[in-house]
Amino acid sequence: MISSNEFKTGLTIEVDNDVYTIIEFQHVKPGKGAAFVRTKLKNVKTGGIIERKFNAGEKVPKAHVERREMQYLYKDGDHFVAMDNETYEQTSLTEAQIGDGVKYLKENMNLGILFFNGTVIGVDLPNTVILEVAHTEPGVRGDTATGGSKPATLETGAVVQVPFFVNEGEKLIIDTRTGNYVQRA
């Protein structure tokens, strides 16, 4: 159990039998009435965000989330197989557990897998990945009426907006959190 006075960003807690990460918190002491803590919580399983108030000093169960470094191996039907880097034990992941990150998965990529009570509750991808451009239209000189970018399909099937000078076969650095082009690799 942890007191609401000890809340900090990134802490994982159990609320209504679900695991949440605190993404924002604020101690509020109104002129009249008892103090409380206003929080913004992100559901680790679904990614949904809720706002919740806790009384000052209220005890909340702390969720003991274990993070294991694993390597993504291959896709097997609807499942994605990852191997623990220490024990070599293989774990099968679903598309729902990986979320939007499935667009950036590449074989032999290292992932952070989050476990709660022995069950996978989330997957942390690296902040950036290097992917090759599989298809993009050639940039036409002087064609900046559309804002200076064009769509490019990457080797994993993800589509991102890239500058006109990017050509097929080039390797790009992509931010997995936003899905945006960062730079050439």
Curated annotation (Swiss-Prot):
Plastid among the record's keywords? no
UniProt-recorded Gene Ontology molecular function terms: translation elongation factor activity
GO cellular component term of the entry, any? cytoplasm
Gene3D superfamilies the UniProt entry points to: 2.30.30.30, Nucleic acid-binding proteins
**Major subcellular location class:** cytoplasm
Cell location: Cytoplasm
The GO annotation for biological process reads: peptide biosynthetic process
Q: Copy the pathway line from the protein's UniProt record.
A: Protein biosynthesis; polypeptide chain elongation
Q: Which PROSITE patterns match?
A: EFP
Q: Does the keyword Ligase apply?
A: no
Entry keywords, A to Z: Cytoplasm, Elongation factor, Protein biosynthesis
Give the family per the record.
Belongs to the elongation factor P family.
Q: What does this protein do?
A: Involved in peptide bond synthesis. Stimulates efficient translation and peptide-bond synthesis on native or reconstituted 70S ribosomes in vitro. Probably functions indirectly by altering the affinity of the ribosome for aminoacyl-tRNA, thus increasing their reactivity as acceptors for peptidyl transferase.
Protein name, please?
A: Elongation factor P
Tell me which species this is from: Desulfitobacterium hafniense (strain DSM 10664 / DCB-2)
Tell me the organism's taxonomic lineage: Bacteria, Bacillati, Bacillota, Clostridia, Eubacteriales
* Chain's gene name: efp
